[in-house]
Amino acid sequence: ITARKDELGFAAFTSAGMDGSSDWRFKTHLANLPIYYEYKADGIGTTDAIKGTYLNNYRQIWDLYINNATCEPTVLSTKTGDDAVAEFVSGKAAFYQNGTWAYGDVASLGDENIGMLPIYIGAEGEENQGLCTGTENYWCVNAKASEEDIKATLDFINWCVTDEVAVKAMCGTDKAMPSGEAGMGFVIPFKGAAESTNLF
């Protein structure tokens, strides 16, 4: 794609903005891949045991992103998450790294024009891995909170995934909120949850 960028009119990747609205996509989400493969290969379970076995793989995928993007690597510090979305939606880039929560940002392209791919970094067996799921994508309840607050929190979480109005707000997109605003478009992997309109 990069060799024919001018002819095609688009780059391979959106800008990898390094401001706070975008850097987490690369400093945490992308960085999870080499850490996962090291945990798996070495049977480790703590960050203290990380040796950086797949650090070069991480560097290579990062270099692929920034050297085949809509902008020069020297301007990454000025690029934002909104820039990346705009570049993808306007057809200036073929690939945009993000997760299911970003569906609403790109849905205007039409479901027939978008999809998700695994990120490959050259780790053995990764062709069988499939899509990543974020390690930070879970709900927590503070064990040090009062029993009353713990119960209220658990009741709220249960309500979010069982109540018809709440599930519609969580899973829906266009006009899914009681206010008529767009819903969150999340995919809820629980029995009985409404099917999400989120393609991802």
Which residue stretches match the model-derived regions?
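Short, hydrophobic alpha-helical packing/hinge segments within bilobed ligand-binding/sensory domains
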Residues: I1, A84-F88, A102-D105, T153, ...
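Extracytoplasmic/periplasmic solute-binding protein
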Residues: I1-T47, A93
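Glycine-centered hinge/linker elements that transmit conformational signals in sensory
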Residues: T2, I44-T78
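Short, solvent-exposed loop/beta-turn-alpha elements that line the ligand-binding surface or hinge
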Residues: G17-G20, I35-Q60, S108, I121-L131, ...
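Short helix-initiation/N-cap motifs at beta->coil->alpha
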Residues: V75-S90
